[in-house]
Design a protein with these regions (language model features):
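Ankyrin repeat (ANK) tandem alpha-helical domains that serve as protein-protein interaction scaffolds
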Residues: 1-265
């Protein structure tokens, strides 16, 4: 009991220690829970540099226990206005990356879900959660593969495509290119992926991923258009711009490439 009192004293009566070693470890949601403990913690948080965060909403994706999720579930009146139904709650629970919390939402609360749940699991590379979603017939669409590609989760993408037979579309290549995941693009070629559109080269160019841009053009034979040049130029990726010019990529209307110089309007 004495030890608990000493810890409590450190938290509420030693700002130097608390502000340096305790509050920085709390996410925004934890901070709001601390604030609500009692009058002492409310004063503490208001004294800190993080008091402005109290105005922000709880984030279900930051919650780490069933007890905190229970509170969020019971306070539906405080859910964001853009949550059209409870499937958004399940989606956010999946973002916690904790399967036991998703199981609680589904099995204890009978929370409805949609494809957003498995998309969140795919982006985080949580194979165990994805297998749970598949086993329990969570809706799935082509965004699951795209989300795995976006975060470079090759094993997840392989599982979704080869085991689950999940569909994929042009976003899979484009989102892989956006974050420079060359290994994902190589896998797509290996699997004879044929959903390329000009978005993939545009993403690679505007984000400065020259290796991906080269691979898309030379190996994957992905199409491109003037947006690739514009994107690379506007985002200051001269190596990508030069590669596009050397390969005769179409230019935006009014732009010219003459005598080794690019003229824009």
């Amino acid at each position: 009991m004495r030890a608990q009192k000493d810890v409590w004293d450190v938290i509420v009566n030693n700002d130097d220690i608390c502000f340096t070693h305790i509050l920085p470890r709390l996410n925004q949601t934890d901070l709001k829970f601390l604030y609500d403990v009692n009058s002492e913690t409310r004063k503490l948080v208001k004294r800190s540099s993080r008091k402005g965060e109290l105005k922000k909403r709880f984030k279900v994706s930051e919650m780490s226990s069933i007890s905190t999720l229970e509170l969020a579930w019971d306070k539906k009146s405080l859910w964001p206005s853009d949550w059209e139904d409870e499937t958004y709650f399940c989606w956010e629970v999946a973002k916690t990356n904790k399967l036991e919390l998703l199981k609680w939402a589904r099995e204890e609360k009978q929370c409805k879900w949609d494809e957003g749940t498995i998309n969140a699991a795919a982006e985080q590379g949580n194979l165990e959660m994805i297998k749970y979603c598949v086993a329990n017939e969570c809706p799935i669409d082509e965004d699951a593969c795209a989300c795995a590609a976006l975060s470079g989760q090759l094993e997840i993408l392989k599982y979704l495509r080869e085991e689950v037979k999940a569909p994929w579309g042009s976003d899979t290549a484009a989102w892989a290119a956006q974050d420079g995941h060359l290994h994902i693009l190589e896998y797509l070629v290996e699997r004879k992926y044929d959903q390329y559109d000009t978005w993939a080269c545009w993403e690679a160019a505007k984000c400065g991923h020259l290796d991906c841009l080269k691979y898309l053009h030379e190996t994957a034979k992905a199409p491109w258009n003037y947006r690739a040049v514009r994107g690379a130029h506007e985002n200051k990726h001269p190596e990508c711009v030069q590669y596009l010019l050397d390969k005769n990529c179409p230019l935006p209307d009014g732009w010219r490439y003459e005598h080794g110089e690019l003229h824009t309007i």
